A protein has these predicted regions:
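Cysteine-centered iron-sulfur cluster-binding motifs in ferredoxin-type domains/subunits
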Residues: 89-99
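Conserved non-cysteine loop/helix-boundary elements of the Radical SAM core domain that shape
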Residues: 111-117, 142-153, 179-183, 191, ...
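Active-site beta-loop-alpha junctions enriched in small/polar residues
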Residues: 142-146, 175-177, 196-200, 237, ...
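Conserved C-terminal portion of the radical SAM core fold
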Residues: 216-277, 323-331
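Single conserved hydrophobic/aromatic residue that forms the stacking wall/gate
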Residues: 335-347
Length: 347
């Protein structure tokens, strides 16, 4: 049986950030860690022939400086929720959770985690954009900031920054079940806390190390009770045995705890992924059922066959609309990939 190191048993630190205050703060929180100085994070992160599957059991941490910009226009497979100036930010790369279907496994060459400690430079880059227009920014697409907040403190800093800039709205997306954060942070109506919620079967089979679905639901309720706008993301929907029963039970569990009328909005979408990412994931995970499903290729993106996709999405629309007004339910269709569609009431 393989013996793995514990998570972050090894920390690689770029020489240029060894004296950075955030580097020191992070290292102070880690015990029994081997610290290795490196010239550039890509020397470790971009090495050839890494096994993401193996690294997921013993992730290393890389502390680095981003010098090439961290703010990007939103990708077409991501939901903009009707926001015109939709961007996302990469202040971290990779996630401490290990969801088999996650596109990060296809996008990055490594399973290790990179934290860019020069958050002040990212804020400066964003302020230059904010001087030109209002921005809707997803800050937690390429990592789960909430899950690693105890180590980085980035969530607190993003909330404080957003409160100072009235033309900025951010989304912080998570699968973490932490309830303790939100009552300790001052709420802002432009900081949307988005929880990805899955059926128990999907979470148990594919969302390794992530918080259990009921823990996420409780955390979402804590965020709402603390004054934060909360988005629930039933996205991606994963096809599984008895999917109707699984998703029906999940919806019942969610809305037995959460008042749907108080949600900011809801996201629904079936699994979809770039063909290039899936090709890489299949090579690394040949035994994964979710990765090796016979998807259809639509304009360079893989999705479920039309009969499965439409059945799943229509089922969820009907189930969720019993609790949430349809003008607050969003769904992305790869048929119209440039924009998500806001659902209209079904007559």
């Amino acid at each position: 049986m393989c013996q793995y190191n514990k998570m972050f048993s090894h920390v690689y630190v770029e020489k240029g950030v060894t004296e950075h205050s955030r580097t020191k703060q992070i290292l102070e929180k880690l015990n029994n860690t081997t610290v290795i100085e490196i010239d550039h994070y890509k020397d470790v992160f971009c090495r050839k022939k890494q096994s993401i599957s193996a690294q997921s059991n013993a992730k290393a941490l890389i502390l680095a400086e981003n010098t090439s910009g961290c703010i990007y226009e939103g990708a077409p497979v991501c939901q903009s929720f009707g926001n015109e100036n939709f961007y996302y930010c990469s202040c971290m790369m990779n996630c401490i959770f290990d969801c088999e279907y996650c596109y990060l496994k296809g996008m990055y060459p490594s399973g290790n985690l990179v934290v860019f400690v020069n958050l002040e430079d990212i804020f400066a880059e964003l302020e230059a954009l904010l001087a030109q227009k209002s921005i809707y920014l997803c800050v937690s697409y390429d990592a789960d900031l909430v899950a690693i907040e105890s180590l980085t403190g980035f969530v607190r800093e993003w909330i404080a920054f957003t409160k100072k800039h009235e033309n900025l709205t951010i989304e912080i997306r998570t699968k973490s079940g932490r309830c303790d954060l939100w009552s300790n942070y001052e709420a802002c109506d432009r900081v949307i806390i988005a929880y990805t919620v899955s059926p128990q079967r999907v979470a148990a089979e594919y969302e390794h190390f992530a918080s259990a679905p009921m823990e996420r639901i409780q955390a979402a309720k804590c965020a709402m009770d603390s004054g934060f706008p909360v988005r629930l993301c039933f996205d991606p929907m994963i096809y599984c045995k008895d999917w109707r029963g699984e998703y029906s039970r999940m919806v019942g569990d969610v809305f037995s705890q959460i008042d749907g009328s108080k949600l900011w909005d809801v996201s629904i979408g079936s699994f979809r992924i770039s063909q290039d990412y899936l090709k890489k994931m299949r090579k690394d995970m040949p035994c994964s059922a979710v990765v090796n499903f016979p998807y259809d290729n639509v304009n360079g993106y893989y999705q479920y066959p039309e009969n499965i996709r439409s059945d799943m999405e229509e089922f969820m629309i009907q189930a969720v609309s019993e609790y949430v007004d349809k003008d607050r339910i969003f769904m992305l269709s790869l048929i119209h990939i440039s924009e998500p569609t806001r659902l209209r009431r079904i007559s």
